[in-house]
Amino acid sequence: MLAIKTLNQFYGGSHTLWDVNLDIAPGSRMCLMGRNGMGKTTLLKCIMGLQTVRSGGIEFDGNDLTKCAAEQRARLGIGYVPQGREIFSQLTVEENLRIGLGVRKNGPRTIPTRIFDLFPVLKKMLNRRGGDLSGGQQQQLAIGRALVLEPKLLILDEPTEGIQPNIVHEIGDIILRLNKEEGLTVLLVEQKLPFARRVASEFCVLDKGRRVAAGPINDLTDEVVRAHLSV
């Protein structure tokens, strides 16, 4: 579904991603891991067209993403939940959700009822401003907004950051449910090991912009954690 091939990226004069290769199969749940500042968010931004790629390729469902504008990538079926959520605090919950409808390739211009099935709190707070929601509720709104697209691939950048434990568990349940019931492919950046081990089927570790370990989540051993993830 998603193939990243020998990807290199620079930020100013700094070489931030070095010959990164990553294949994400349809229906998989890939967790991108690494210490802070190792290139995880940069890689997601390259996939979404928010950072330029110096060399290498990114293919999604047979499409060369390096030749697609950022909004075009969403229309191809990629939902994106950025770090920090980036909801519109002055807009209502409903207005935030409707923003996603504008880039849907096909289908009705109405919020899918599935969103409220997954996140009942959003239905109760439709007319509340996004800025009035708690951090956990805002994260649910950000995920809901991405799912309005009915994507094939959902990308989440640290979805548990700053979220209360009960909401973290709910988000994990929803990711697993969407994957099992709808075959949704998931790529997430995550720092919390218990969450990663619960939700992911596969992992990839970046260290100083290089891929240093990858495989089934059961291969995420204590040795790998000590070498590349421990602070």
Kindly give the residue locations of the regions a language model identified:
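The feature captures the beta-strand-to-loop junction immediately N-terminal to the Walker
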Residues: M33-R35
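Helix-to-loop junction immediately C-terminal to a conserved catalytic motif
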Residues: M48
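Conserved ABC transporter NBD signature motif
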Residues: G56-N63, L76, P108-T110, G215
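Conserved ABC ATPase signature
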Residues: R129-L133
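ABC ATPase C-loop
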Residues: A146-L147
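Conserved catalytic motifs of ABC-family nucleotide-binding domains
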Residues: E150
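Helical segment within the ABC ATPase nucleotide-binding domain
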Residues: H169-G183
